[in-house]
Structures are given as structure tokens and as C-alpha cells.
């Protein structure tokens, strides 16, 4: 039975095209490693995916007047095209938008909660009464109410 190798690459936010630094800093080295181990007869699983729910996606969607889903879908498709063009050999390049990811995330959360590793707490957050939503930290600019930094974001 061949040795099993897992290569897990960091998931890029799907809010912009992958730049040369992303490609050469994580995806290409992972691919080189996977190819090496495959040549050595090892069973390799190289995985990654698009982070479709991060704050950068929401920020870009708001700035463009479109939904976060539209931003994610466009960039995820371009990621796949790029990897195919340069020959990156992912066994699975998925996203945080799949039903499987949702299921596994919920399972991890409920398992932690059921075993006493999570707790309920109250936290102050910025809220817009005009937009009727809470603001992520990247949307809040001005003087920090905690440290007094006048250029806080």
C-alpha cells in the first residue's frame, strides 16, 4: 500500500484574481510537491478552495453594488481557469459555498458546543440603524473607542 500524502493549500479569498505572489507562493510549490510524491509512487491528495464568505468578498460586493455570491462565483471560475492554464494538479479545488462545507462546518461547531468548548457571551458591535445591519470591522473608520487611535479601521 503506497504512503498517503495530503497537501492542503491555503484558501484564497474569492474577491480578486490570484496574483503571481499567490501562485508562486502557495499553489505552485504545492503542485511541485504533489508531482514529486506522485513520481515516487505515493498516493497524493492535493486540496484547496475558494473562501467565498470572507469579509473581503462582502467589501468588494458592496463597493460594486452586487451580491457577494456574484463576486465569489466570478473569481472562483477564474481561479479554476488559471490553474488549468498553468497545469496545477489539484485533486479537489472546492469552495466554502458547497453543501458539504456547510454540513462539515455545522458538524464541527455543534460537536464543539455539545462538548462544552463553546460558550455564550455578549459583545459590543457597531450597528447601522439606517442600514439595519451590524458592521464588520473593515467598514468602521474613525477614532477607536478603545485605544483612541484617530485613524482606526
Residue locations for each model-derived region?
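N-terminal, positively charged nucleic-acid-binding surface of large information/translation enzymes
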Residues: 1-153
